[in-house]
Design a protein with these regions (language model features):
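N-terminal secretory signal peptides
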Residues: 1-19
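N-terminal export leaders
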Residues: 13, 19-40
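Twin-arginine (Tat) signal peptide motif
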Residues: 16-25, 72, 128, 159, ...
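A generic secondary-structure signal for well-formed alpha-helical elements
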Residues: 32-39, 73, 79-84, 136, ...
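Signal peptide processing junction and immediate N-terminal pro/mature segment
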Residues: 42-47
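Carboxylate/His-rich catalytic cores and anion/metal-binding grooves
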Residues: 73-102, 157-163
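Long, compositionally biased charged/polar accessory segments in the mid-to-C-terminal portions
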Residues: 210-290
Length: 290
């Protein structure tokens, strides 16, 4: 019954967007050519202004403090039951947060490496949301998070193509849950509050929404607001960062750590010219690097 309801919801979403089967197939054929013609900036900048959300959860990453240990990547995989790719599967790997090593300068032992840690940007104006034909990708109206309804995803990968940050990954294989695959999983005891993802759908970073849900429920039960210090370690990548490079909080709270850091002269965002307004903000020492 549940599966039938999910199918009906997906069909309703298609009809709401006036997508017949024929039109949908034509759109599938055209999307690659359209995006190859450099339409991503147009998609991003043409979006209407969104209503302000109650919270604007964001992450600040200090590049000067990131040591490239990738503890963030490993802890994220454990928390969200993301399988580890073998050397043969690297092209089809799934990384909810990835660390890019961009360039290396100098010689050992005086080596300077530019590192770019990159989770989902949870954009204010996410192009992935507008290109999804079935409403599987959506923006949380209260928190501004860009999330995924896995049961609706049809695997068209429009969102993957539209994302200018490469933050979305297609699930090429069955998930590592139970049975014979149990011993192969990085985390043999999967997190019960993290939704399962199935073969043929897209997944990505959620800013650890399952942990945020628990904190919000606790604060509501106690009849109080969420404190900034409680938010800081909500994301598992923040909690396990050895260099203390990551910070998480609410940009709508002007006194929060992330708000103060975002207003500093060291702050910048990736591809700001696209108008996506990402909620991952980077800090760098401009005088030390080209």
């Amino acid at each position: 019954m549940e599966e039938k309801n999910q199918i009906e919801e997906t069909i309703a979403a298609l009809e709401k967007k006036n997508l017949s089967r024929g039109h949908f197939l034509k759109l599938t054929a055209a999307v690659g050519a359209a995006l190859a013609a450099s339409n991503i900036p147009k998609i991003a900048t043409a979006m209407p202004a969104k209503n302000k959300t109650k919270h604007r959860y964001a992450m600040v990453i200090d590049l000067a403090r990131c040591i490239g240990c990738e503890a963030c990547t490993v802890s994220c995989k454990v928390e969200h039951n993301v399988p580890v790719a073998s050397p043969k599967e690297l092209a089809r790997r799934i990384e909810w947060t990835e660390v890019y090593f961009l360039k290396e300068k100098g010689a050992y032992p005086f080596v300077n490496i530019d590192i770019d840690p990159r989770p989902c940007m949870h954009c204010e104006h996410p192009p992935c949301v507008d290109v999804c034909p079935v409403g599987a990708t959506y923006q949380d109206k209260d928190r501004g998070l860009v999330l995924q309804r896995y049961e609706r995803c049809i695997g068209c990968r429009y969102c993957t193509t539209a994302c200018p940050y490469g933050a979305r990954y297609f699930n090429w294989s069955k998930p590592y849950y139970g049975g014979k695959l149990r011993e192969e999983a990085l985390n043999p005891d999967p997190h019960p509050q993290v939704k399962k993802r199935y073969k043929g759908i897209v997944e990505k970073c959620t800013f650890c929404v399952e942990r945020l849900d628990r904190l919000e429920a606790k604060a509501e039960k106690e009849g109080r607001a969420i404190r900034d210090d409680e938010l800081h370690n909500i994301c598992t990548c923040v909690k396990t960062c050895m260099g203390r490079a990551r910070h998480f909080g609410d940009l709508n709270d002007l006194n929060s750590t992330v708000s103060k850091l975002a207003r500093s002269g060291r702050a910048f965002r990736l591809l700001e010219e696209l108008g996506t307004e990402p909620k991952v903000i980077y800090l760098r020492d401009w005088g030390n690097k080209a």
